[in-house]
Amino acid sequence: MTDILAKIAAYKREDVADRKRRRSIAQLEAAAKAANSPRGFKAALEADHAPGKLALIAEIKKASPSKGLIRADFDPPALARAYAAGGASCLSVLTDGPSFQGADGYLIDVRAAVSLPCIRKDFLVDPWQVAESRALGADAILVILAMIDDAVAADLMSEAARLGMDALVEVHDEAEMERAGKLGSTLVGINNRDLKSFVVDLAVTERLAVQAPSDALLVTESGLFVAADVARMEAAGAKAMLVGESLMRQADVAAATRALLG
């Protein structure tokens, strides 16, 4: 685990312990059951992918550890509507506060503003967070293999399935892709960003895609800025892309989204 992930995992475990003290599992389960039904995150990506076109998971992100503040004019519901107007298939909403200036309320507000499926972009280290994600309205969760062992990953995926949610399993290298296959992952995200140097290289997707489970829908993450990047990733075998920073920095988010999708 890299230093940044170790730091995040440490504060996230403390945060989860505090949240558990304030909210019983019974209360959480009741809230999860009361939430609107999951919208089908993976199904939306499958429906929107076509030859020559990647489905888009558009990310709502105010800041990041590597880039600092990304968008000062930050209105999650308005951004969600702009992404929807631009043709996004799904949305990714950052809810981590310390590293990304996210908030749980952003996910609630975004899901109320649009009809697109939403993934909660956070750092999950405990199955309790999966039920919490469903209670917040999330349709999918992120499982970062660089941060957890296979036992925890399996528990997160099982809990997501129980609650009718999809799990996007994120990998960064060959060893993690092999783990994703053994875990039975059918929605795999390849992060093109090196978590130690923060350098982004689209060749990571090209290298790892050939090792992906044959039945997995591949999502390429980070480093896509122009239509040529999209075409390159589709040629590598990706069926969807997760894009945040390059769109968040645009004045006209809807127009930028349309341009990226071609």
Swiss-Prot record:
UniProt-listed GO biological process terms: L-tryptophan biosynthetic process
Keywords (A to Z) from UniProt: Amino-acid biosynthesis, Aromatic amino acid biosynthesis, Decarboxylase, Lyase, Tryptophan biosynthesis
Top enzyme category: lyase
Enzyme Commission no: 4.1.1.48
SUPFAM superfamilies to which the protein is assigned, alphabetical: Ribulose-phoshate binding barrel
Gene3D superfamilies recorded: Aldolase class I
Pathway terms, separated by semicolons: Amino-acid biosynthesis; L-tryptophan biosynthesis; L-tryptophan from chorismate: step 4/5
Highest taxon, organism lineage: Bacteria
GO MF term list: indole-3-glycerol-phosphate synthase activity; phosphoribosylanthranilate isomerase activity
Catalytic activity: 1-(2-carboxyphenylamino)-1-deoxy-D-ribulose 5-phosphate + H(+) = (1S,2R)-1-C-(indol-3-yl)glycerol 3-phosphate + CO2 + H2O
Family label: Belongs to the TrpC family.
NCBIfam families found in the cross-reference section: PRK00278.1-2 (NF001370), PRK00278.1-6 (NF001373), PRK00278.2-4 (NF001377)
Protein name: Indole-3-glycerol phosphate synthase
Annotated organism of origin: Caulobacter sp. (strain K31)
